[in-house]
């Protein structure tokens, strides 16, 4: 399957709040369709919805998600926790968590258009896996800084995770360490994703 480019609010109404997909929030209890649809949920449906939350939040294709699950399965530790750590350490997600972009698709666009440097080198791959001590900056060009300036100037919607630090005057972010499981931005049962 390809990356989802359709209406985002439909997915949010169906799956709940996904901060990486869009900044919009569904009205609580006002949607009649969800009240009609809330019948008995099968185990398959529960697992599928958890997997879809993960896919749409991080902007992954089905193949990418399968690859991440395979890598997490080979690593030491809980497969679900390792999977979330791998996804949280992607460059597009780190830009979103630093507040340099409003959504993960917006962060992907910044990376694809070569506005972002990692350790002084241009990186144009949104799935680039950041490591501890990586320094993430924008190009020195005025256009690159102007794209990010609005997002850095506004207060972040949520608290900055402990594994990241940002210097908003120099348009620079630093990855201090691998993310801890309590700072993961999406509330999800990762074991259901692995079981799916």
UniProtKB/Swiss-Prot annotation:
**Residue ranges of every copy of the S4 RNA-binding domain listed in the record:** 89-150
Locate the region Disordered: 16-36
Q: Which Pfam families match?
A: Ribosomal_S4, S4
The Gene Ontology biological process terms listed for this entry are: ribosomal small subunit biogenesis; translation
SUPFAM superfamilies registered for this protein in UniProt: Alpha-L RNA-binding motif (SSF55174)
Naming one, the record's GO cellular component terms include:
small ribosomal subunit
Q: Which UniProt keywords apply?
A: Chloroplast, Plastid, Ribonucleoprotein, Ribosomal protein, RNA-binding, rRNA-binding
- Tell me where on the tree of life, at the top rank, the source sits: Eukaryota
Query: Does this UniProt record's set of keywords contain Calcium?
Result: no
The subcellular location is: Plastid, Chloroplast
Record SMART domains: Ribosomal_S4 (SM01390), S4 (SM00363)
Predominant subcellular localization, coarse grouping: plastid
The family database entries (Gene3D superfamilies) matched by this protein are listed as: Ribosomal Protein S4 Delta 41, Chain A, domain 1, RNA-binding S4 domain
The record's annotation in InterPro entries points to: Ribosomal_uS4 (IPR022801), Ribosomal_uS4_bac-type (IPR005709), Ribosomal_uS4_CS (IPR018079), Ribosomal_uS4_N (IPR001912), S4_RNA-bd (IPR002942), S4_RNA-bd_sf (IPR036986)
Q: Which GO terms describe its molecular function?
A: rRNA binding; structural constituent of ribosome
- On whether Transmembrane helix is a keyword of this UniProt record, the answer is no
Q: What does this protein do?
A: One of the primary rRNA binding proteins, it binds directly to 16S rRNA where it nucleates assembly of the body of the 30S subunit.
Subunit notes for this chain?
Part of the 30S ribosomal subunit. Contacts protein S5. The interaction surface between S4 and S5 is involved in control of translational fidelity.
Q: Which family does it belong to?
A: Belongs to the universal ribosomal protein uS4 family.
The protein's name in its UniProt record: Small ribosomal subunit protein uS4c
Source species: Rhapis humilis
**Originating gene:** rps4
């Amino acid at each position: 399957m390809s990356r989802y480019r359709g209406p985002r609010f439909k997915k949010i109404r169906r799956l709940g709040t996904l901060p990486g997909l869009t900044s919009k929030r569904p009205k609580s209890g006002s949607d009649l369709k969800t009240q009609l649809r809330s019948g008995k949920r099968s185990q398959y449906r529960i697992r599928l919805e958890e997997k879809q939350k993960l896919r749409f939040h991080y902007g992954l294709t089905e193949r990418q998600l399968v690859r991440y699950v395979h890598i997490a399965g080979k690593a030491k530790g809980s497969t679900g926790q390792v999977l979330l750590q791998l996804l949280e350490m992607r460059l597009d997600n780190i830009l979103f968590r630093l507040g340099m972009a409003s959504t993960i698709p917006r962060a992907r666009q910044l990376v694809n258009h070569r506005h972002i440097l990692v350790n002084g080198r241009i990186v144009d791959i949104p799935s680039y896996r950041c490591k501890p001590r990586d320094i993430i900056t924008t190009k020195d060009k005025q256009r690159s800084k102007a794209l990010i300036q609005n997002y850095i100037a506004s207060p972040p919607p949520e608290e900055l995770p402990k594994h990241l630090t940002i210097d908003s005057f120099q348009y620079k972010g630093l990855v201090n360490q691998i993310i801890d499981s309590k700072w993961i931005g999406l509330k999800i049962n990762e074991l259901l994703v692995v079981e799916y």
